[in-house]
Curated annotation (Swiss-Prot):
Has activity against Gram-positive bacteria. Has insecticidal and hemolytic activities. May act by disrupting the integrity of the bacterial cell membrane. This is M-poneritoxin-Ng1f. It comes from the Eukaryota. The modification Lysine amide is found at residue 20. One of its GO terms (biological process) is killing of cells of another organism. It comes from Neoponera goeldii (Ponerine ant). It is found in: Secreted; Target cell membrane. GO terms for molecular function: toxin activity. Belongs to the non-disulfide-bridged peptide (NDBP) superfamily. Medium-length antimicrobial peptide (group 3) family. Ponericin-W subfamily. Keywords: Amidation, Antibiotic, Antimicrobial, Cytolysis, Hemolysis, Membrane, Secreted, Target cell membrane, Target membrane, Toxin. Expressed by the venom gland.
Length: 20
């Protein structure tokens, strides 16, 4: 559960990069 949340948190910067 915690590992999944950590994975999502790590993916956030990549998603933000797509919008920039």
């Amino acid at each position: 559960f915690i590992g999944t949340a950590l994975g999502i948190a790590s993916a956030i910067p990549a998603i933000v990069k797509l919008f920039k």
